[in-house]
Design a protein with these regions (language model features):
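Alpha-helical transmembrane spans
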Residues: 1, 163-212, 301
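Short, amphipathic alpha-helical interface elements at domain boundaries
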Residues: 1-170, 206-246
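Compositionally biased, intrinsically disordered low-complexity regions enriched in proline and serine
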Residues: 4, 15, 21-25, 44, ...
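Short hydrophobic helical membrane-anchoring segments positioned at the boundary
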Residues: 10-30, 133-141, 145-166, 200-353
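A generic alpha-helix propensity feature with a strong bias for hydrophobic helices
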Residues: 32, 189-192, 275
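Short, structured secondary-structure boundary patches
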Residues: 93-101, 181-182, 276, 283-287
Length: 353
């Protein structure tokens, strides 16, 4: 028992160090296994959690771009307003290489495309409005799916997670006990105050340390460094003409982070030659959407935003349907709609990380 307590105290102490930091990071972290969902989870991670549901529109859009880079989907630019999305021929063999969060998105696209052979963002939005339960519930599994993957791959510590859960349960117990005593035995306030103080202490222990392993902390810092690199690109005075294949990958994560507009503007300022007409668009996955003079200059951003609205449509329809049913039964408020970005992890009471 004594050993177990000492081990928990060691985990709490060790987990508050926050030893990793990168001003800029130029590679895709853990590129072979990276997905927009995992990137956003680690980027948004605060203390002991990361609620990415508030960013599902961006994650959904970025995942579709990434599936195209992996050869699972194909885009066809019909005109300035319409992009068709196809399942690529031979994609069945590639499905086993996808991460589970990517498969959730792929399954939705397969259903939206079924029977016609392709879909567009408008058709996909109509599908999401009809099948809102399916779309909303499947995409809201991304958060837990990503967390499970990160735990399985050693980036979230099972030990730290268990300690955090234990302190969360204690916190609930202390506050519940304080409330019950206040209600039924108000003449002994000392016990109520003591339980409240214990609850506050338990909450601090639950939220004020990171459940990430060293590897997870390092990768989280790398994602922050990559985002900053993309945001500050025009300030870095990099002379070499960028590799378009690499920047297509960057744009996946710029889309997930919600900064693709800014990144493209900076590229145009520093390397306008990347946006001139070229004969080799077929070498790339979607660079013609970014730079081809045949299409409007905002086509890529319009396309990625329209993809994000697919999830928004499903969420709004789900909210309306479930709010009306819960209000009819007097339950109210059955839908949380997605939390504030990044799960603040206990706010200012934790101090710096």
């Amino acid at each position: 028992m004594k050993y177990k307590k000492e081990r928990e105290e060691m985990i709490l102490q060790y987990s508050s160090s926050g030893i990793y930091d990168y001003e800029y990071f130029r590679d895709i972290p853990d590129e072979k296994n990276a997905t927009p969902g995992k990137a956003m989870y680690l980027y948004m991670f605060r203390k002991n959690s990361a609620n990415i549901n508030s960013s599902l529109s961006q994650i959904f859009s970025a995942t579709i771009l990434n599936l195209a880079l992996k050869g699972v989907l194909t885009f066809e630019m019909v005109n300035d307003k319409e992009v068709r999305i196809y399942i690529s021929s031979g994609s069945a063999e590639k499905l086993n290489t996808l991460e589970r969060d990517e498969k959730l998105v792929y399954e939705l696209i397969s259903k939206a495309i079924w029977g016609k052979g392709y879909t567009t963002t408008k058709e996909f939005s109509r599908f999401a409005s009809r099948e809102y339960d399916l779309v909303y519930s499947k995409l809201n599994r991304i958060d837990n799916t990503v967390e499970d993957i990160l735990e399985e791959t050693g980036k979230i510590s099972r030990d730290k997670k268990a300690v955090a859960k234990k302190w969360s349960k204690k916190q609930i117990g202390y506050f519940t006990g304080a409330f019950m005593i206040f209600m039924f035995m108000p003449y002994i306030p000392a016990i109520t105050i003591g339980l409240v103080l214990l609850g506050i202490s338990a909450r601090k222990n639950a939220v004020c340390f990171s459940i990430l392993t060293d590897e997870g902390e390092d990768e989280a810092a790398q994602w922050k460094g990559l985002k900053k690199y993309m945001e500050d690109y025009s300030l870095l005075n990099e002379k070499q003409v960028p590799d378009i294949v690499l920047w297509e990958k960057y744009l996946v994560y710029a889309t997930a982070f919600g900064i693709s507009d800014k990144v493209i503007r900076q590229l145009k300022m520093v390397h306008p030659e990347m946006f001139e007409a070229r004969d080799d668009y077929n070498r790339y996955t979607y660079w013609n959407m970014v730079s081809s003079p045949r299409f409007n200059s905002n086509m890529f951003n319009d396309f990625s935003r329209d993809l994000g609205r697919v999830y928004d449509r499903a969420r709004n329809a789900y909210s309306a349907a479930h709010s009306s049913s819960s209000s009819g039964s007097g339950g109210g408020g059955g839908f949380s709609g997605g939390s504030s970005g990044g799960g603040g992890g206990g706010g200012g009471s934790c101090g710096g990380r």
